[in-house]
């Protein structure tokens, strides 16, 4: 989720999306 990365800061998305 690109919006989540920009919003959350890419640290929370790391665990969610696994990026």
Curated annotation (Swiss-Prot):
Keywords: Methanogenesis, One-carbon metabolism, Oxidoreductase. It is an enzyme of class 1 (oxidoreductase). One of its GO terms (molecular function) is N5,N10-methenyltetrahydromethanopterin hydrogenase activity. It catalyses: 5,10-methenyl-5,6,7,8-tetrahydromethanopterin + H2 = 5,10-methylenetetrahydromethanopterin + H(+). Very sensitive to O(2). Its EC number is 1.12.98.2. Pathway: One-carbon metabolism; methanogenesis from CO(2); 5,10-methylene-5,6,7,8-tetrahydromethanopterin from 5,10-methenyl-5,6,7,8-tetrahydromethanopterin (hydrogen route): step 1/1. Coiled coil: none annotated. GO terms for biological process: methanogenesis, from carbon dioxide; one-carbon metabolic process. Belongs to the HMD family. Homotetramer. Catalyzes the reversible reduction of methenyl-H(4)MPT(+) to methylene-H(4)MPT. This is 5,10-methenyltetrahydromethanopterin hydrogenase.
